[in-house]
């Protein structure tokens, strides 16, 4: 049983060098790991030789003459002391080597576009007929260059989601929430509460019908499990730690759902294992100062429905495509125009071998914005968490995949921009209406500004 990164380190370290180059990361730590592994293997060879020599001596002691026996016992003791020393050396070498290897990113897929940052992300397909305000036409044409995307040109300016929700509809309040908890928090009221619940039910219903098991996970995790699902050296600033406790609030249900199978071994007929998680998500949004400060698009707390797959290694590419297709179905039914983007090598997180983003069209901003992130993490997480596949005695690491199905606050933001009318009312997508009809107080077909209600 071998981890892809460790196997490459020993068989062809140039694979790892090239992987780091393609990710625009430094090579120095890798060279250190190669040297440590060389010393470790030399020490293992020496240790095995010493153990074999000690065993030979121990076997000869009972047959030796009394005078010779004492010398053999002395030699066996000396070898034993050397074995103990080498075992300590091996432990230190393996700890330092493995610490470096644990920081190594997943081997990226050959289909990933190469580039240092998000500017090199590659759109691969578009869906829908976006409403494009005349003032945003140039921006839209730039973002759809190379694709023949049909659009509807409009001569009025939709309100941005923040103003629509807080000023026009008056059903979100980030000011009061800010006084209570600080920036990037919010209150939802009335119809927007019902809309959020309908979105959750819609996504859970749709994904579970595809064979995914619904799960509500713990909302906190211990550090040693978090180390298994993310590169905590870079991610720790993004999550909340409980003061005085070895616990972190989860940033997504992906993390506890993947960690749920830590130490488990699957048989071939037990895979794929499919889950759809529902949880609040807590994020510091470190490094986003000044970005999306208004509204509920980028917040510290939100609810998300997440898809998780544990698969055989040879099937993970198939499941990666299925996961993004599931997300596309959701946003097609919500009638949100979108594009699918293949994320560039330099913009990938350490755990992902390949990632797609689904970016929804926001008419008021004139931009496609991220709504879904869909990653194939290959054996990066399973190695750390020791999640294995047993093929009739031959063991290997499973592959793990994750994808947003629906994040409520961003989806609400997309709905109020794309389904907004000139009078400020918002049409509710037909796909959500059956989840609202059962509640007497819930809106059914539209969300109406308070001023319009008072006039009527």
From Swiss-Prot:
It comes from the Archaea. Its main location: cytoplasm. It is found in: Cytoplasm. Pfam families: Seryl_tRNA_N, tRNA-synt_2b. GO terms for cellular component: cytosol. L-serine binds at residues 252-254, 306, 404. PROSITE patterns: AA_TRNA_LIGASE_II. The keyword Transit peptide does not apply. Keywords: Aminoacyl-tRNA synthetase, ATP-binding, Cytoplasm, Ligase, Nucleotide-binding, Protein biosynthesis. GO terms for molecular function: ATP binding; serine-tRNA ligase activity; tRNA binding. GO terms for biological process: selenocysteine biosynthetic process; seryl-tRNA aminoacylation. Its EC number is 6.1.1.11. Consists of two distinct domains, a catalytic core and a N-terminal extension that is involved in tRNA binding. PANTHER family: SERYL-TRNA SYNTHETASE (PTHR11778). Catalyzes the attachment of serine to tRNA(Ser). Is also able to aminoacylate tRNA(Sec) with serine, to form the misacylated tRNA L-seryl-tRNA(Sec), which will be further converted into selenocysteinyl-tRNA(Sec). This is Serine--tRNA ligase. It comes from Korarchaeum cryptofilum (strain OPF8).
């Amino acid at each position: 049983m071998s981890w892809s990164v460790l196997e490459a380190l020993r068989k062809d370290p140039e694979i790892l060098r090239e992987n780091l180059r393609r990710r625009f990361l430094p090579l120095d730590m890798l060279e250190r790991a190669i040297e440590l592994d060389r010393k470790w293997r030399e020490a293992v060879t020496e240790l095995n030789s010493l153990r074999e020599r000690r065993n030979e001596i121990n076997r000869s002691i009972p047959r030796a003459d009394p005078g010779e026996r004492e010398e053999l016992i002395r030699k066996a003791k000396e070898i034993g002391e050397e074995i103990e020393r080498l075992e300590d050396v091996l432990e230190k070498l393996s700890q330092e080597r493995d610490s470096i290897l644990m920081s190594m990113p997943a081997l990226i897929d050959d289909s990933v576009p190469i580039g240092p940052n998000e500017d090199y992300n590659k759109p691969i397909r578009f869906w829908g007929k976006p409403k494009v305000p005349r003032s945003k036409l140039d921006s839209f044409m730039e973002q759809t260059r190379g694709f023949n995307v049909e659009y509807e040109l409009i001569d009025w300016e939709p309100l941005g989601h923040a103003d629509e929700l807080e000023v026009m509809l008056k059903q979100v309040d980030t000011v009061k929430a800010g006084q209570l908890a600080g920036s990037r928090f919010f209150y939802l009221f009335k119809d927007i509460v019902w809309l959020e619940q309908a979105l959750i039910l819609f996504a859970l219903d749709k994904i579970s019908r595809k064979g995914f098991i619904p799960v509500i996970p713990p909302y906190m995790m211990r550090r040693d499990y978090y180390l298994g699902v993310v590169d905590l050296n870079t991610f720790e600033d993004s999550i909340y730690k409980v003061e005085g406790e070895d616990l972190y609030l989860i940033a997504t249900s992906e993390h506890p759902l993947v960690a749920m199978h830590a130490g488990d071994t699957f048989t071939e007929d037990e895979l794929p294992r499919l889950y759809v998680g529902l949880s609040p998500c807590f994020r510091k949004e470190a490094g986003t100062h000044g970005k999306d400060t208004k509204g509920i698009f980028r917040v510290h707390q939100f609810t998300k429905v997440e898809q998780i797959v544990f698969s055989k290694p040879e099937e993970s590419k198939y499941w990666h495509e299925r996961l993004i297709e599931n997300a596309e179905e959701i946003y097609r039914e919500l009638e949100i125009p979108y594009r699918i983007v293949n994320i560039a090598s330099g913009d990938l997180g350490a755990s992902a071998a390949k990632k797609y983003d689904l970016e929804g069209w926001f008419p008021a901003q004139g931009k496609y914005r991220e709504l879904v992130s869909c990653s194939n993490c290959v054996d990066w997480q399973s190695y750390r968490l020791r999640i294995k596949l047993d093929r009739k005695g031959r063991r290997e690491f499973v592959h793990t995949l994750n994808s947003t199905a629906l994040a409520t606050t961003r989806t609400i933001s997309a709905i109020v921009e794309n389904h907004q009318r000139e009078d400020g009312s918002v049409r509710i997508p037909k796909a959500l209406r059956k989840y609202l009809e059962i509640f007497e107080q819930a809106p059914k077909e539209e969300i109406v500004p308070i001023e319009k209600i008072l006039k009527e």
